[in-house]
C-alpha cells in the first residue's frame, strides 16, 4: 500500500528535482509529513475493508438475523456458565481446605483431652473436664409419689394392700392435669390385677381403696408387689405415669405398714395376646331390632393342657350395669381358630339404642371345672377405640350389617370399664 501511495505522489516531488538551484534538504520534511498522513488513511481503509468483508461473509450465510442474534446470546450464556463453574470450583476448594484444617485442629484438641490436658477455652473459663460432664448429666425426673399401706393376716393367709393417695403427679393431658388410676398386682403372677377408680383432672388424687391377695406366708417372700399409676385416656392406650415396686422379702409384716414412696419410671406392659374376634352388627331403627352375628375368632390363647381350647361365645345385652338378655354360641372343640357364623337378635327401641352395651366374651369350655374366660370386648356409645367406631358405623348405616375385627382384652379390664360407665 505504501509503494502505491508513493507512486501516486511522484508528480508532486518531480518539479522540485528539476530546478538545479533548489536545495535538496528542504524536500525531506515535506516527504515525511505526506508519508504520515498516508499511513493514517491506509489504516482506516484497511478497517473499512475488513468490516465490509466480514458483513459480506455473514450475508452469505443462509440464516435470518434473529437466528444469528440468538446464537450470539447462547454463546454468551455458555461463556458466563463456564466462568461461574470455574469460580465455584475455586471457592469449594478453599472451603474444603478450611474444613480439613478445622477438623485436624479438632482432632488434635480431642487427643489433648484424652491425654488429660486442658484446652485454652477451659483454662480461661476455669472449667475442668469433670465439671463439664457434671453439667451434662440430667436431673432425675420427678414423677410424683404414692402413699400405701400393707397388712398381713397370718390366720387367713391374706395380704391387704391399701392404695391411699398420690401427690405431685406430672400432667399428661392437654389441660395441664391427668386422669390417674392405679393397677395393683403381685409378680410374677399378673393374672390377678386390681384397679382403683379413675380420678378425673387431678394431680393429687385420694384413692382410699383396699385390695386383698390370698397368699400363704411361705410363698409371699418370693413375690413383688407392684402399684402402677396410669393416666386414663378414653380414645387411646393409657400411659403409665410411674410405679412403686415392693419386694415382699424386704418388708416386715409383723405389724401394719403405711408409708410414702417416690414413683419410678415404669416399663410399658406388653399386653398378653388373647386373640381376635370378628363380629357383625346390624340395626333396623324402624323395627327396633339389633342383630349381632358372631362370625369367627383367630389366634385364641391356649387354655387346655394339649395346647388347644374349646371356645364358645357369650353375648350379654347390658344397660346401666344390668344384664338385660344373654345368648351363647355352640362350643367348637379343640381349636384356636373357631368359625361360628351364628346370629342373635335383640329388641331395642330407637330411643334406647344409645343407652345399651353389647358385651362379647370368648370362653374356654371345661367339662369338669369352671369355664374360663379367654377374653372380652364390648361395643356401645361409651366404648372406646375400634369398638366405638364399630358401633358408630352401625348407627350411621341402618339396615346394613357392619363387620369388624376386635382384639380381645382381659376380662378384668373390660369389667372395670363397664363399672366406670354405670
Swiss-Prot record:
Residues 31-41 have a biased composition (Polar residues). It is found in: Cytoplasmic vesicle, Secretory vesicle, Synaptic vesicle membrane; Cytoplasmic vesicle, Secretory vesicle, Chromaffin granule membrane; Cytoplasm. Exhibits calcium-dependent phospholipid and inositol polyphosphate binding properties. May have a regulatory role in the membrane interactions during trafficking of synaptic vesicles at the active zone of the synapse. Plays a role in dendrite formation by melanocytes. (Microbial infection) Receptor for C.botulinum neurotoxin type B (BoNT/B, botB); unlike the case with BoNT/B interaction is not improved in the presence of gangliosides. The toxin binds to the vesicular domain of Syt2 (residues 1-61). Changing residue 59 to H: Nearly wild-type binding of fragment 1-61 to BoNT/B heavy chain. This is Synaptotagmin-2. Glycans are attached at residue 32. It comes from Rattus norvegicus (Rat). Predominantly expressed in brain regions such as the spinal cord, brain stem and cerebellum. Residues 1-60 are vesicular. Residues 119-139 have a biased composition (Acidic residues). Keywords: Calcium, Cytoplasm, Cytoplasmic vesicle, Differentiation, Glycoprotein, Membrane, Metal-binding, Phosphoprotein, Repeat, Synapse, Transmembrane, Transmembrane helix. Phosphorylation at Thr-202 by WNK1, changes the calcium requirement for SYT2-binding to phospholipid membranes. Pfam families: C2. Homotetramer. Heterodimer; heterodimerizes with SYT1 in presence of calcium. Interacts with SCAMP5. Interacts with STON2. Interacts with PRRT2. (Microbial infection) Interacts with C.botulinum neurotoxin type G (BoNT/G, botG). Changing residue 46 to A: Nearly wild-type binding of fragment 1-61 to BoNT/B heavy chain. It comes from the Eukaryota.
